[in-house]
A protein has these predicted regions:
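Active-site-proximal loop/hinge segments that shape catalytic or ion-binding/gating pockets
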Residues: 1-217
Length: 217
């Protein structure tokens, strides 16, 4: 269990998108500031599914209190080294071209900083497109520590049928609707020192960059 003040959320992107993010922040797909030259690294089929998928927010109960469109929100994970990253790096599903770890950058924000924006947000207790996943709104944010399974989220081992539940819970998401200004980015994670130098050349301070090859596959 974590203190809400210590929770960080993570988003990965191609290094080519970083200059735009430094200037405009993490932008929503419908934002006036969106990156017209955005370089995608994700599973195009999953992106397509999410763009139109309706989900019910039930706050863990049987009755839906609100229906939202998953594709209207910017998704974050609660830790590094997610199953989707494995697919992005190695290919498979509908990832057209694998992406080298050196080209993948983590953008890390403090959850409490994001909450201060007062934007519409939700979070899930597992993979967002699985039918048995529950979604929660801001009325449950103070219970996030007990709703999420942190042992699963931080687990390094999730492969195989025997770990299906771990894999599902590991991919819990935080969803936010709207742009996140660059000042709320706490730090960046990259694969090695050569990429760190590239990020410094973009104008990112050394103190805001962490090298962590263990965050990759």
């Amino acid at each position: 269990m974590k203190n809400i003040n210590d929770i960080e959320i993570y988003r990965i992107t191609h290094i080519d998108n970083i200059p735009h993010i430094l200037k405009n922040g993490i932008t929503h797909k419908d934002s006036l500031k969106k990156n017209l030259n955005y370089k995608n690294i994700g599973d195009i089929s999953l992106i397509s599914i999410r763009s139109s998928k309706k989900i019910g927010v039930s706050n863990g109960k049987d009755n839906v209190v609100k229906e939202i469109n998953l594709g209207d929100f910017i998704p974050f994970y609660f830790d590094v080294r997610m199953p989707m990253l494995y697919v992005i790096q190695h290919g498979g599903n509908y990832v057209e071209n694998p992406t080298n770890a050196k080209d993948i950058i983590y953008i890390v924000c403090k959850l409490v900083d994001i909450l201060s924006l007062n934007l519409e947000y939700y979070f899930s207790n597992g993979h967002a497109t699985d039918y048995f996943t529950k979604f929660y709104d801001k009325t449950k944010i103070n219970e996030i520590n007990t709703i999420l399974d942190w042992e699963c989220i931080e687990s390094k081992y999730w492969g195989g049928e025997e770990n299906a539940v771990i894999k599902w819970k590991k991919q819990a998401e935080f969803l936010i609707k709207g742009d996140i200004p660059p000042k709320l980015i706490k730090y960046f994670i990259c694969y090695d020192n050569s990429i760190r130098e590239n990020l410094i050349n973009f104008g990112i301070s050394e103190q805001s960059i962490k090298i962590d090859p263990d965050a990759y596959f």
